[in-house]
Amino acid sequence: VYKTYPNISGEGTEKDAAIFRYASKMAIKGDYSRIAFGTYIGGVLDILQIDDTLGISPVKTLGIYKPVYTKVKNSPDAITWGDETPIGFEAMDASDRYLYTLLNGTLGKNLKAKDAINNPPFTEKISIFDWNGHAVKQTYTGKKLMGLTNKGDSICYAVAYDDNYSLLKIEPFK
């Protein structure tokens, strides 16, 4: 069992664990040798090595956006996103070579904005990382993306909010 959360909150293990528990996304490398977690509150990418003999060990923690959160009233250990929370990873999938992510970056207040229904704050980019945590590429789609999956490294499928939840076929490295 792995219980060593990266120190991202500055407030200790319980808050770090809460940040990683709140709507985080997870992807596993095809050979099961690595696992990645991306936080929704802030954008923290945590990549771990999985070894049957050595157990689980950290590979890279990449702090893209600082995890700013709001405490839930009457529940001291619970947190949620707030107006100043950078929204991080909304979706994640993996191949043997790359992590394909929807990394947003908008602030929580934009999710509650009056025009959010007509102009929703979803990302239009697929952000691609290698399994060592290096940013490899961003593919701009021109569509507001809500979910994605990949088929190897040549094709991603994504759900676009813009066109009544249409399914897009995207070639991320073209």
Model-derived regions: residue spans:
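Beta-propeller blade signature
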Residues: 1, 47-50, 114-135, 171-173
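Surface-exposed loop and turn segments in beta-propeller and other repeat-based domains
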Residues: 1-21, 51-84, 142-144
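Short consensus segments that form the blades of beta-propeller domains
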Residues: 16-17, 35-38, 113-119
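Structural signature of eukaryotic scaffold interfaces centered on beta-propeller domains
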Residues: 18-41, 84-95, 148-151
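Residue position within the beta-strands of beta-propeller blades
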Residues: 37, 101-102, 157-159
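Short glycine/acidic-enriched loop and turn motifs that connect beta-strands
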Residues: 41-44, 106-110, 162-165
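Loop/turn-rich, solvent-exposed surfaces of beta-rich toroidal or solenoidal domains
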Residues: 82-129
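Blade-level signature of beta-propeller repeat domains, shared across WD40, Kelch, NHL, RCC1
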Residues: 149-174
